[in-house]
Amino acid sequence: MRLKYVFSILIYRDYSMPTLEDVKVLGGIGALCSLISFVPYVGWLISIAGFILVLIAIKYLSDIFHEPQIFTNLIIAIAAYIVGIILFFVIIVGSLLSFIASPPHENSPNLAPLLGIIVAFLAFWAACIVGGVYINRAYGRMAEVTGVELFRTTGLVYLIGSILVIILIGLLFLVIAKILEAVSFFSIKEEAPPPPLPPPVY
């Protein structure tokens, strides 16, 4: 039933008038789909589809509450992750090609590949931290406008996972964040809470 609703949103819905129900269903199902990348053959496709659904849900939420910065922060986070991945592979490949092209050293080992690997991991790690910071900002604001405080926890777990990804345990935190993300979306009420009060001016 939920999947049928998702298809009806994507095909028949008036995109100029998104609702919180759209955000709830698209975001929740999208987050769950992102978790099943391990399924043979089609898992990665389902995961990408889920990622796109979450993006659509957050764009809808930004539009509903007139909070474009939420979606902007998310896009910055995604861009940081992509840049980190690209830098990682470019530095690794460049180091290996340099090692292959350089003449052998008889008296001292060539440490260029090792240094390249270290730099690649550090660049990837830095990009992940930047991405985690912006995701945390986006989900923190989502918690404020929707009244679902679990979004704030989701953003924090994403940030922790991004920081710890360099030692692999961060991947577990990212999986937990995805689960919390799904629960957060499904916890959205169709009636929006009153907007948070602006900070006092002294």
Regions found by a protein language model. Give the residues of each.
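Glycine/serine-rich loop-strand microenvironments at binding/catalytic pocket rims
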Residues: 35-39, 92, 115
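Membrane-helix interface motif
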Residues: 89-102
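Hydrophobic alpha-helical transmembrane segments
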Residues: 112-128, 166
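Membrane-interface interhelical connector segments
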Residues: 99-112
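Membrane-interface extramembranous regions at the lipid-water interface
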Residues: 6-37, 43-85, 111, 127-163, ...
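General secondary-structure edge motif
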Residues: 38, 106, 119-122
